[in-house]
Amino acid sequence: MNEKEISEIRRRFRADKSNITHVRGCYINEKQEIVSQFDQPLSLLPQEECENMLSVLRRTLSGTLGKNLIEMPFTTAQVVDSDEHRLLMALRDSKLTDEEAVRMFFEKVIASYRPEGTYLILLANDTYDVPYRAKDGETLEDASENIYNYVLCTVCPVKQTKPVLGYDVPENTFHNRDIDWLVSAPQLGFLFPAFTDRSADIYSAMYYCRSASESYDEFIDAVFNREAPMPAEEQKTTFGTILGDALNDACSLDVVQTVHSRLCGMIEEHKASKDPEPLTITGRTMKTMLTACGVPGEKAEKFEEACAEQFGADAALSPRNLVETKKFEIETPEVQIRVDPEYSEWIETRYIDGAPYILIPAGAGVQVNGVPIAITHPDVEYEEEE
């Protein structure tokens, strides 16, 4: 799925667009016990509550592709004959009316997802009459291409509110508000089947994870029977470690600045092009980039080999997971320097009197702890004011 296809399905989760008739739910306490289950018809909900329910579901299709939204492919063997794929198909094909399939799915999630507090599992089914899209991009609502039948799973923490004072308008007094339980933003979930090339793709699901540092290995293994992908934050850390270890003494400030600048440039160009397909690079691409930066060939080769070992051979990585586009940071054990990436080239390293220094040009407007300071030339003498 690309960004346009994700956006197209996300727009379905509105009262005037959706064909969702009911939502199945399972509420689990901190002891991993089922507190209650429900099958809620949306038509019986007040409009505001219906919109809130759809809003919670819609957020399972939010975030950045490749970071929060990750494609989960199934093998041909899984599609032909596997328990995990058969269960997902049963949920979809029955439109969540297969009680045994729903029960098995809830039990599978409960056994593989163990947060600290209580949480809610939501299941929704929608049937989308996909409108025809002409070559010029214009959508013809009255001309259907195919029917896309899918299920969306959302797992949300349920958190207790804190006791607070509330104002009672009729009585003109303040009272403690009752403690309540509120459904928080989705922590994880998935869409099945994927909406690839604007049609159902039973060979893939779109997995959602709110945190870029969590992987939820057990959940992914239970639902998709595959190894969890490396979280985005771990990808960034691993990439930096590989870069430093492989290049060793060739990993200079100039090299890191250039790599950061070029990856950020690729991200900006991709954004400006409005290409819906995700931007990816490989270890081979990075090897070419490093060679262009002046890194010796054998060290660039070592970097490519380390990438293949850590991420997989020919792994397609998102540059957004490898660099911070809005931050350039330099750290020593005693000092931390943060610079707008646009001005990172102002920083340089230099040996002065045999000691290594990090140099930053200081213009006007320098402050220390909020206090404006003057930086004077050592040869300039102060003139005392009379």
Feature locations, PLM:
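Long, hydrophobic alpha/beta structural blocks
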Residues: 14-326
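Soluble regions of membrane-associated proteins that transit the secretory/organelle pathway
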Residues: 2-7, 31
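Short, isolated positions in well-ordered beta-strands
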Residues: 12, 86-88, 101, 337, ...
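C-terminal, beta-strand-rich globular interaction domains
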Residues: 291-386
